[in-house]
Amino acid sequence: MFFKQYSAKESTLSYFLGCGTLGKAVAVDVVAGDEQWFIDRAAEAQVTITHVIDTHVHADHYSGGRKLAQLASAHYCLHESNAELVKFPFHPLHDNDTIEAGNVIIKVLHTPGHTMDSVCLLVTDKRRGEQPWFVITGDTLFVGAIGRPDLAGREQAMAAMLFDSIHSKLLSLPDEVEIFPGHQAGSVCGAGLSGKPSSTIGFEKRFNPGLKVTNKNEFVKLLTGEIPPRPAEMDRMVAANIAA
């Protein structure tokens, strides 16, 4: 298995992973303008990009996911709930779907709360073992912070949904599972993000302020009480990311 984390604009973290042995690769949360980086890495590794995934429709940056998918003749993937929102065809992701990139297995976890369409990606390398190795958490869970719940409006209800998603889908994973988030410090997609670009489930359980709160009502109060300003061009970015 190969795995690369790419630090992009707006404190965004993108990912490129796959199986060099069988020549398959997946790109995650590609920022517009970075498409060639993924094309070049695929050429260097002599792999074919089969899937390009956005963990949700982004509101803080312009996505390069669909363009990369077109350049690579790959599937462009979003959660199925976007079927009536986006204005173009895409490969729908469903909860518990699996994507095989050679010996690398990616399991889709639907984790609504930051947005209704948010997904996390649980990754297993079959050559390493049958247990999951790490999870790409998008804007659901950050190092030291939780994703903001207000970008779709209804922040109280979305924060409660985020609590359920995190506790049922992520905190049930083994403590040693690594997490790779969609952003690091400097992003407006959460409050109090660490500059460290990775962590583990166990470490976040111990030290992430949002995960220390185990009562849902208290979690909602905490999360809605410290919401950063909305992204300056949010409406324009969302419109561009769903446009035909």
Predicted feature descriptions by range:
Residues M1-T48, L121-G138, G144:
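Conserved beta-strand hairpin/beta-sheet module of binuclear metal-dependent hydrolase folds
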Residues L17, D29, H56, L68, ...:
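Divalent metal-coordination and catalytic microenvironments
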Residues A27-V30, T48-H58, C77-E80, H110-G113, ...:
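Active-site neighborhood of phospho(di)ester-bond hydrolases with catalytic His/Asp-centered motifs
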Residues D34, V57-Y62, A83-V86, M116-D117, ...:
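Active-site environment of divalent metal-dependent phosphoester hydrolases
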Residues D34-C77:
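Active-site metal-binding motif and surrounding structural segment of the metallo-beta-lactamase
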Residues N82, F88-I146:
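Active-site-adjacent scaffolding segments
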Residues R128-G129, W133-F134, G144, Q156-A244:
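Divalent-metal (often Zn2+) His-rich catalytic cores of metallo-beta-lactamase-fold enzymes
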